[in-house]
Amino acid sequence: MPMFIVNTNVPRASVPEGFLSELTQQLAQATGKPAQYIAVHVVPDQLMTFSGTNDPCALCSLHSIGKIGGAQNRNYSKLLCGLLSDRLHISPDRVYINYYDMNAANVGWNGSTFA
């Protein structure tokens, strides 16, 4: 159930076609979880600053049942910062990503939970 959320001040018009699909496929590969369970939410046009400037930036979160931890998070950070840099032109030093290891009983889907 990985869910990746990107809040950014990058304009909607600058988000390339296929970016969400690319994030989905890359996260499926990185987490080892099926793409059918991965949700991606990109929220452009946000009023945001980072280091006191309005240059492109992003505040992100990755939620997952398992597959969250030290070495894994470093790999995700490298992957996701790379994609945000390549596709949205956001410098990696202007991105924060928070990681959340979710309890399966606390994640609802399809009328039930993952527990």
UniProtKB/Swiss-Prot annotation:
PANTHER family reported in the protein's UniProt record: D-DOPACHROME DECARBOXYLASE, MACROPHAGE MIGRATION INHIBITORY FACTOR
One GO cellular component term: cell surface
Organism from which the protein derives: Mus musculus (Mouse)
UniProt keywords, alphabetically: Acetylation, Cytokine, Cytoplasm, Immunity, Inflammatory response, Innate immunity, Isomerase, Secreted
Protein known as: Macrophage migration inhibitory factor
UniProt modified residues of type N6-acetyllysine: K78
Role, per record: Pro-inflammatory cytokine involved in the innate immune response to bacterial pathogens. The expression of MIF at sites of inflammation suggests a role as mediator in regulating the function of macrophages in host defense. Counteracts the anti-inflammatory activity of glucocorticoids. Has phenylpyruvate tautomerase and dopachrome tautomerase activity (in vitro), but the physiological substrate is not known. It is not clear whether the tautomerase activity has any physiological relevance, and whether it is important for cytokine activity.
Any one GO biological process: positive regulation of lipopolysaccharide-mediated signaling pathway
Recorded family membership: Belongs to the MIF family.
Gene3D superfamilies in alphabetical order: Macrophage Migration Inhibitory Factor
Reactions that this protein is recorded to catalyse: 3-phenylpyruvate = enol-phenylpyruvate; L-dopachrome = 5,6-dihydroxyindole-2-carboxylate
